[in-house]
Amino acid sequence: MTLLSPGIELKETTVQSTVVNNSTGTAALAGKFQWGPAFQIKQVTNEVDLVNTFGQPTAETADYFMSAMNFLQYGNDLRVVRAVDRDTAKNSSPIAGNIDYTISTPGSNYAVGDKITVKYVSDDIETEGKITEVDADGKIKKINIPTGKNYAKAKEVGEYPTLGSNWTAEISSSSSGLAAVITLGKIITDSGILLAEIENAEAAMTAVDFQANLKKYGIPGVVALYPGELGDKIEIEIVSKADYAKGASALLPIYPGGGTRASTAKAVFGYGPQTDSQYAIIVRRNDAIVQSVVLSTKRGEKDIYDSNIYIDDFFAKGGSEYIFATAQNWPEGFSGILTLSGGLSSNAEVTAGDLMEAWDFFADRESVDVQLFIAGSCAGESLETASTVQKHVVSIGDARQDCLVLCSPPRETVVGIPVTRAVDNLVNWRTAAGSYTDNNFNISSTYAAIDGNHKYQYDKYNDVNRWVPLAADIAGLCARTDNVSQTWMSPAGYNRGQILNVIKLAIETRQAQRDRLYQEAINPVTGTGGDGYVLYGDKTATSVPSPFDRINVRRLFNMLKTNIGRSSKYRLFELNNAFTRSSFRTETAQYLQGNKALGGIYEYRVVCDTTNNTPSVIDRNEFVATFYIQPARSINYITLNFVATATGADFDELTGLAG
């Protein structure tokens, strides 16, 4: 501030700034998985992290899982989005597995605890059913029927899930109950809920239909965190304050299968529930305890460590990696063991549209910093889906203009096909010729690169060999090149282009066949005896001759634009004067000089003066800088000339070096 009386005011500023290098080896992948968050970006840094987050591969998810796994053999920063079909995918819940019932006639004079027996024809199948709620007149409002024995019998007689007319429910009343009729429907297979995005989870949990089912069966709202069959392996033990005090003598009912099991809460917790609104919650997965926590159904309640333990707040903040829950309509004093079921990944139902929606999460370059898109991970899908999705990802790359999209041919074009026919298929798919007029990859983009093969690879999780697209490996080669060399070096060739974990390739091409592929900007992948399996080309997906028709030049310019572009934002709202232009020119020239010294640039020039910042440009509040760059080029073609000469010939004279 301005001094109004004698004194000393100290001010500090700086005129120094620099261009900072940013990551160039972060990859992105969208695909189908059997577990994990849907339609949100998750960072994965290693294979263990991949398995824990998205589950192990299945036949339907292997292409995507193994593509992700393959990239992580080279790099260590992968961003993944899981795609699901919103209409069919389900989170496991305690609703599935219950018997749907209708209280056709509520009767009168019944009491809570009156027994209900489920019969098949004349045989007693389940004898532990009970009335759980009646009104003042003894009319039945709610019942509980364990389903474990009913499930087994229904499977045995071929009446699963719909229970036919042979199934009946009989009520044995100890309180002179009269005239009630309960009609049995089907064993519920639909969990009734999908939590796709975490921000919408609370709305899904408190939806009218889902809450009505919870109230009908008298169970709290606890579900698996993610959609998929793996949620069926989750079990939740919930213990009230009263039952916690009983220790192992508290026998907890198991929902919905039936039976009881002794509480283990005393052995797990040092401090249990302190009030009647608190519950000890133990989460098991595959019978192993993975989480234990005391939570409350009362808003604002805290634990002994003064931490907020309100159920809705705890789960909304991501308190569990396994379950999600709500306190709404939580049965007062509930104790029991919930076995979840009905989870569906529904990967067979995922469409090209679902995959494209997942890829759209990477469209904004300001919020998502990735440089390598593994679009070819979908190459195992149908010809139409593989072509459509990869084109969409290329359009994202073209719009971002800061990344490289790695694409692979659809599996049916190369796997199990003679090499000559496979090469024809690749060329026709690339050029929209022959039978590929509708489903093709007839694009031109310097922000994409196409490989021309698939690899046969061992799947250690299922003990089988699988055909896997190579796009993730090519992205991995780019990331590894950044680590062992520089971004502007080509990822192809014997020095940096070695592909890992290959049993064999789908096709082994010869020179003439590789020539055909390379002319259409398809980079061959080949294997020669003793030299490994190698990326044998570094073209981008364009037919326009330019410096950008090579991967190394494209990645060089992506890096330069990103790094210099981020530095330039600090000129926003500064004055467009000689000092600003000179400082920016000096700063960027120093950065480019460093790249030149490392071999990425042959020559460069930065123009940022009054020639491109004219008075009219300045009056429009604009700032212009132009960079002229001679990028380093990779060697694609080697010619070795051997000349025989006469004995005693003068080599200097023959080569024109004499005199």
Curated annotation (Swiss-Prot):
Gene Ontology CC: one annotated term: virus tail, sheath
Cell cycle among keywords: no
Pfam family, one: Phage_sheath_1
PANTHER family xrefs: PHAGE TAIL SHEATH PROTEIN (PTHR35861:SF1), PTHR35861
Subunit-structure text: Hexamer.
Family classification: Belongs to the myoviridae tail sheath protein family.
Protein name, UniProt field: Tail sheath protein
Organism of provenance: Enterobacteria phage T4 (Bacteriophage T4)
